[in-house]
């Protein structure tokens, strides 16, 4: 073989090799492999919704999800919008993980199944991003299907025990239900009930027209509900407790669609 022919053969081989690698790269670009996020380990723990479709989630839209294992979990939420009334304090759910798809199957009440399918896009120690599809089945018929993107943040605090006792405080934001400039008092009991007090002269007395008076704390989410003059009311707060002080904050929406942040500050008195 002459030197000229030898170089021609080598050049042709290199061109063919380049074509092969280019073809492979192109195929991979068209069909990228889904990265293994190791969800069975990384997802374990407590998570709370922080954003919904790229917007900050209102506090009344927040859900706390706890993954105990790759097969079992719990959900806590309070919903009272439209016809969707739910009061779930640690509702047990079955969990299934297949690749980067996490499915939760919950039974909030007899005849009702809620299936939540989460396509996890990313996850680290602090945050998780997922396309979330929720289907509600009532007596075997799919009634509601919602699809949206959600961002979750990991919750490490648990104030369910720290909140027990009596707290007195006042609103610290400009717009709020309790924006009357007065002190307010709540007594949180271990059985999931609470007592709301009002000032009568120099004495604190239970608010007479309130009934039901239930609450739960999951992580740092405080949910309450009560009946006043036959009408059920609910509230949602994110809380912190330290050194005998409790702070509440909530992102809320006004009737015109604008949002504001309500805050409350309390001191433990008993």
State each model region's role.
Residues 2-5, 17-45, 148-157, 263-270:
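Bacterial Sec-dependent N-terminal signal peptides
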Residues 7-14:
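Sec-dependent N-terminal signal peptides
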Residues 39-43, 77-82, 135, 158-163, ...:
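Short beta-strand segments and strand-loop junctions that repeat across beta-rich extracellular domains
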Residues 39-58, 152, 156-179, 212-214:
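Tryptophan-anchored aromatic micro-motifs
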Residues 43, 47, 67, 102-104, ...:
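Fold-core signature of tandem repeat domains
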Residues 49, 67, 94, 117-122, ...:
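A structural signal for short, hydrophobic beta-strand segments that form beta-sheets
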Residues 58-103, 107-109, 177-225, 229:
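N-terminal glycine/threonine-rich, aromatic-flanked beta-hairpin/loop signature
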Residues 134-166, 210-215, 250-270:
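Edge beta-strand at a domain terminus
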């Amino acid at each position: 073989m002459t030197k000229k022919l030898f170089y021609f053969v080598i050049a042709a081989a290199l061109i063919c090799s380049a074509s092969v690698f280019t073809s492979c790269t192109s195929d991979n670009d068209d069909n990228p492999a889904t990265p293994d996020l190791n969800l069975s380990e990384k997802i374990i723990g407590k998570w709370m919704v922080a954003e919904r479709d790229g917007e900050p989630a209102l506090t009344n839209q927040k859900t706390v999800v706890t993954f105990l294992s790759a097969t079992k979990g719990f959900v806590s939420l309070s919903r009272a919008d439209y016809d969707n009334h739910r009061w779930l304090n640690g509702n047990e759910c079955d969990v299934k993980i297949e690749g980067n798809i996490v499915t939760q199957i919950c039974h909030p009440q007899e005849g009702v199944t809620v299936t939540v399918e989460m396509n996890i896009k990313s996850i680290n120690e602090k945050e998780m991003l997922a396309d979330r599809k929720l289907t509600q089945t009532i007596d075997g018929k799919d009634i509601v299907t919602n699809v949206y993107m959600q961002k979750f943040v990991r919750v490490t605090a648990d104030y369910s025990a720290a909140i027990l006792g009596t707290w007195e405080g006042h609103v610290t934001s400009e717009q709020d239900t309790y924006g009357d400039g007065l002190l307010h008092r709540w007594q949180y009991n271990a059985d999931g009930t609470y007592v709301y007090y009002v000032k009568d002269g120099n004495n604190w007395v239970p608010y007479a027209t309130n009934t039901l008076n239930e609450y739960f704390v999951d992580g740092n989410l405080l949910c309450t509900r009560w009946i006043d003059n036959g009408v059920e009311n609910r509230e949602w707060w994110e809380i912190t407790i330290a050194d005998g002080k409790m702070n509440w904050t909530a992102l809320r929406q006004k009737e015109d669609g604008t949002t504001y942040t309500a805050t409350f500050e309390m001191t433990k008195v008993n």
